[in-house]
């Protein structure tokens, strides 16, 4: 279950109902998908082949199709980041630059953890700490950045309206 940390006051929201309510009020789509469907050989696997990525997409194809129909998404892929990723530190520096997109930024966490820091409606930032099974959609034009948690590894399904709209605007 995702957790929220509000930057300015350093308070946390950990209750599932309160997390969902907070994100809904901020215009952030949050869903919990059934991660137990993931085959054991793909659980915590950060060295994915193209076949592994296709299998992950197949396992969650119903959920991807459902959210895509509801939200107008048209493309998806799988990304894996870990300490074995070439230039991981350089990638994280780029990810941590505050930016926005002209489309939603959608991630479903398959393995590992990630944090989206999002500028709230009141102008203050909050972290959404994600774990396997969490799906988040950062709304278009919302200022945000992404980073990894202490384990420095994540496998995520990325879902797009268009890949062109996903280009960061700093």
From Swiss-Prot:
Q: Which domain of life is it from?
A: Bacteria
Pfam families, alphabetized: ARD
- Please tell me where Ni(2+) binds in this chain: 99, 101, 105, 144
GO biological process, alphabetically ordered: L-methionine salvage from methylthioadenosine; L-methionine salvage from S-adenosylmethionine
CC cofactor: Fe(2+); Ni(2+)
Q: In what pathway does it function?
A: Amino-acid biosynthesis; L-methionine biosynthesis via salvage pathway; L-methionine from S-methyl-5-thio-alpha-D-ribose 1-phosphate: step 5/6
- EC number(s): the record gives 1.13.11.54, 1.13.11.53
Annotated Fe(2+) binding sites: 99, 101, 105, 144
Q: Which InterPro entries match?
A: ARD, ARD_bac, RmlC-like_jellyroll, RmlC_Cupin_sf
* Residues spanning the signal sequence: none
Which residues does the UniProt site feature Important to generate the dianion point to? Answer: 107
Per its record, the protein catalyses: 1,2-dihydroxy-5-(methylsulfanyl)pent-1-en-3-one + O2 = 3-(methylsulfanyl)propanoate + CO + formate + 2 H(+); 1,2-dihydroxy-5-(methylsulfanyl)pent-1-en-3-one + O2 = 4-methylsulfanyl-2-oxobutanoate + formate + 2 H(+)
Q: Kindly state which keywords UniProt assigns to this record, in alphabetical order.
A: Amino-acid biosynthesis, Dioxygenase, Iron, Metal-binding, Methionine biosynthesis, Nickel, Oxidoreductase
Residues flagged as site, May play a role in metal incorporation in vivo: 98
Q: How does it assemble?
A: Monomer.
Function recorded in the entry: Catalyzes 2 different reactions between oxygen and the acireductone 1,2-dihydroxy-3-keto-5-methylthiopentene (DHK-MTPene) depending upon the metal bound in the active site. Fe-containing acireductone dioxygenase (Fe-ARD) produces formate and 2-keto-4-methylthiobutyrate (KMTB), the alpha-ketoacid precursor of methionine in the methionine recycle pathway. Ni-containing acireductone dioxygenase (Ni-ARD) produces methylthiopropionate, carbon monoxide and formate, and does not lie on the methionine recycle pathway.
What is the name attached to this protein's record? Acireductone dioxygenase
Source species of the chain? Bacillus thuringiensis (strain Al Hakam)
Q: What is the lineage of its organism?
A: Bacteria, Bacillati, Bacillota, Bacilli, Bacillales
Q: Which gene encodes it?
A: mtnD
């Amino acid at each position: 279950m995702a957790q929220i940390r509000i930057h300015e006051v350093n308070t946390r929201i950990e209750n599932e109902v309160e997390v969902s309510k907070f994100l809904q009020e901020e215009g952030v789509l949050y869903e919990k998908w059934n991660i137990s469907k993931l085959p054991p050989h793909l659980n915590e696997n950060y060295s994915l082949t193209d076949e592994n990525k296709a299998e992950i997409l197949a396992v969650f194809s119903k959920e991807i199709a459902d959210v895509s129909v509801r939200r107008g998404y048209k493309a998806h892929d799988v990304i894996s980041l870990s300490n074995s990723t070439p230039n991981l530190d350089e990638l994280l520096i780029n990810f941590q630059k505050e930016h926005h997109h002209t489309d939603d930024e959608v991630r479903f966490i398959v393995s590992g953890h990630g944090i989206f820091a999002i500028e709230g409606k009141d102008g203050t930032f909050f972290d959404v700490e994600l774990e396997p099974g969490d799906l988040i959609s950062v709304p278009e034009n919302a200022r945000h950045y992404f980073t990894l948690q202490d384990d420095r590894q994540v496998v995520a399904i990325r879902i797009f309206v268009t890949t062109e709209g996903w280009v960061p605007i700093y």
